[in-house]
Regions:
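Small-molecule kinase domains that catalyze NTP-dependent phosphoryl transfer to phosphate-bearing small molecules
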Residues: 99-103, 123-124, 144, 148-193
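Glycine-rich phosphate-binding loop of ATP-dependent small-molecule kinases
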Residues: 1-67, 187, 192-194
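Amphipathic alpha-helical segments that mediate coupling or scaffolding at interfaces
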Residues: 8, 51, 80, 94, ...
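Short glycine/proline-enriched coil/turn segments at helix->beta-strand junctions
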Residues: 22-24, 104-109, 169-171
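Residue-level signal for inorganic ion chemistry
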Residues: 12, 31, 91, 110, ...
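ATP-dependent small-molecule kinase phosphotransfer cores
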Residues: 35-108
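An amphipathic alpha-helix signature
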Residues: 23, 45-49, 135-140, 150, ...
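ATP-dependent NMP and nucleoside kinases share a basic, alpha-helical "lid"
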Residues: 97-104, 111-145
C-alpha cells in the first residue's frame, strides 16, 4: 500500500516527513526529485530546452556537465513559468510524468508532494495524508522561512488549491498548528495503516 503526503506551503509537511524518517520510513520527495531529474535526465533537458529555449540551462565549464548533470537557469525557467498558465502546464506535462516514473522505479511506499492532487500523482498512491495548519500560522512560517512579506506569503498560498478542498479528498489529516501533538497523530495513523 502506497501513501502520499500533501499539504499547502507552510503547513509543515516536510517536518512531518522528518518525523516519519525518525520512525524508519523513507519518503520520496517529489519536489526534490523534479529538480534532480531536470539536472540529470538527458530527455528532460532536451524537451525543456525545446520548449523554453537555449537559455534553459547555463553553459558552464564545470566537470558536472560531463558527469551527466546540468545547471538549470532558474531565472529563465521562472520567467517562462510566470509568463502564462499555459507555460506552467507545458512544463508540468514534461516534468510530472518523469517524476511519476521515477517514483514507481524507486520502490518506495511513501511520497511527499505539495501538488499531489493537482499533478495527478495521487493516482499512484492508495491513501493520502494531508498536513494542515491555520492560514495565519502558515503565513507566519512562510514569512520567517523565506524572509518574504506577508503579501507575498498570501500570494503563494493563493496559488495552491484551497486547504479545505485538499482536506476533503484526503484519507487522513495531521493538524500541525503548533499546539496539537504531531507525534501522537503520526503514531495513530501509522497504527491504523498497519
Amino acid at each position: 500500500m502506497k501513501t502520499g503526503i500533501t499539504g499547502g506551503i507552510g503547513s509543515g509537511k516536510s517536518y512531518v516527513c522528518k518525523l516519519l524518517a525518525e520512525r524508519g520510513i523513507t519518503v520520496y520527495d517529489c519536489d526534490s526529485a523534479a529538480k534532480r531529474l531536470m539536472r540529470t535526465s538527458q530527455e528532460l533537458r532536451q524537451r525543456l530546452t525545446d520548449l523554453i529555449g537555449p537559455e534553459t540551462y547555463l553553459h558552464t565549464h564545470h566537470a558536472t556537465a560531463e558527469q551527466g548533470e546540468w545547471q538549470l537557469n532558474k531565472a529563465a525557467v521562472a520567467q517562462f513559468l510566470l509568463a502564462s498558465e499555459a507555460n506552467a502546464h507545458a512544463v508540468d506535462a514534461i516534468v510530472h510524468p518523469a517524476v511519476f516514473h521515477d517514483f514507481e522505479e524507486s520502490g518506495l511506499q511513501w511520497m511527499e508532494s505539495a501538488i499531489l492532487f493537482e499533478s495527478g500523482i495521487n493516482r499512484l498512491v492508495d491513501r493520502v495524508i494531508v498536513v494542515t495548519a491555520p492560514e495565519e500560522v502558515r503565513i507566519d512560517r512562510i514569512m520567517k522561512r523565506d524572509a518574504i512579506s506577508r503579501e507575498k506569503a498570501i500570494e503563494w498560498i493563493g496559488r495552491q488549491w484551497p486547504q479545505e478542498e485538499v482536506r476533503q479528498r484526503a484519507d487522513f489529516e495531521i493538524v500541525n498548528d503548533g499546539v496539537a501533538d504531531l507525534n501522537q497523530q503520526i503514531d495513530n495513523i501509522l497504527h491504523i495503516l498497519e
